[in-house]
């Protein structure tokens, strides 16, 4: 089973926005929109209280290309709009290396950091019992 939760607050830059023209900031947001539209994924782009954010929820029996597309889309948006920040939480019990843990993808200042979660992981016994005696 695969479980993915993602949220990315989109901001054009982490630097002083006053040093950018409105046109250049709007161009960044147009690029972000194109990235999302061409991703081939079921991402949700929303605006709330003057803030743009991107969310992803995926539950699947097996990992598919959509999982990788979501992660790559978040990376592309983060590199384009460098003020963006957010997180993807991923659990894939068929991943030979990370089968018993959540993986975290942290996005900030145009970078993506991949870590292993230590709150819910190891999934067995932290959030589930070992019902098969593995």
Language model features: what each stretch is:
Residues 1-29:
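Short, extreme N-terminal segment that most often corresponds to the first beta-strand
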Residues 7, 57, 89:
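Residues in well-ordered beta-strands of folded domains
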Residues 13-15, 63, 95, 112:
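Generic "edge-of-domain/loop-turn" microfeature
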Residues 25, 73-85, 122-134:
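Ampiphathic alpha-helical segments that act as solvent-exposed interaction surfaces
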Residues 30-75, 79-81:
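Short, intrinsically disordered low-complexity segments
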Residues 38, 85-90, 118-122:
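Short C-terminal domain-edge/linker segments immediately following a structured domain
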Residues 61-107:
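Amphipathic protein-protein interaction modules
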Residues 96-134:
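Acidic, proline/glycine-rich low-complexity IDRs
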């Amino acid at each position: 089973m695969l479980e993915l939760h993602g949220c990315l607050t989109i901001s054009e830059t982490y630097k002083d926005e006053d040093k950018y023209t409105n046109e250049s900031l709007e161009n960044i947001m147009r690029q972000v929109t194109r990235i999302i539209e061409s991703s081939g994924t079921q991402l949700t782009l929303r605006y709330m209280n003057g803030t743009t954010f991107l969310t992803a929820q995926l539950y699947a029996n097996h990992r598919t290309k959509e999982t990788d597309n979501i992660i790559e889309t978040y990376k592309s948006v983060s590199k384009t709009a460098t003020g963006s920040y957010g997180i993807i939480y991923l659990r894939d019990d068929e991943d030979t290396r990370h089968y018993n843990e959540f993986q975290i993808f942290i996005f900030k200042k145009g970078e993506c950091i991949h870590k292993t979660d230590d709150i819910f992981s190891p999934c067995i016994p932290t959030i589930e019992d070992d019902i098969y005696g593995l």
